[in-house]
From Swiss-Prot:
Record SUPFAM superfamilies: Ribosomal protein S16
Chain spans, region Disordered: 81-122
Assigned keywords, A-Z: Ribonucleoprotein, Ribosomal protein
Basic and acidic residues biased stretches: 81-90, 99-109
Entry coiled-coil feature ranges: none
Organism field: Roseobacter denitrificans (strain ATCC 33942 / OCh 114) (Erythrobacter sp. (strain OCh 114))
Gene Ontology CC terms: cytoplasm; small ribosomal subunit
Name the UniProt record assigns to this protein: Small ribosomal subunit protein bS16
Family: Belongs to the bacterial ribosomal protein bS16 family.
One GO MF term: structural constituent of ribosome
Gene Ontology BP terms: translation
InterPro entries membership: Ribosomal_bS16, Ribosomal_bS16_dom_sf
Entry superkingdom: Bacteria
């Protein structure tokens, strides 16, 4: 059975409230789940302790059983210190794109041209 630790939406329209649950990945998002592990209320301030509540012991148990947290739940677990932060490798993120590199080269060429003229005049 492929287990997931994920959010199941509750609450009324425009007033979301989520349960953090351990569920079979083939079940519907708000459908049958095996165990409720906690709650998440996005309407509360980010620094509120009531915003995310979870039973750390049961979460560790399900992670030990091979349950995979969804991306959002994984972030919550990292913030709570229940899981190590996943390293992401994106080496090209910091490098400028082709057009930005061309603009930088043109700017450098324009800046170098007057300096060369001054050196030749002396």
């Amino acid at each position: 059975m492929a287990m997931k630790i994920r959010l199941a939406r509750g609450g009324s329209k425009k007033r979301p409230f989520y349960r953090i649950v351990a569920a079979d990945s083939r079940m519907p998002r708000d459908g049958r789940f095996i165990e409720k592990l906690g709650t998440y209320n996005p309407l509360l301030p980010k620094d509120s302790e009531e915003r995310v509540k979870m039973d750390a012991e049961r979460v560790q148990y399900w992670l030990g059983q091979g349950a995979q947290p969804t991306d959002r739940v994984a972030r919550m677990l990292e913030a709570a210190g229940l899981r190590e932060k996943a390293e992401r490798n994106n080496p090209k993120k910091g490098t400028p794109g082709k057009k930005a590199q061309e603009r930088a080269e043109e700017k450098a060429a324009k800046a170098a041209a007057p300096a060369e003229e001054e050196a030749a005049a002396e």
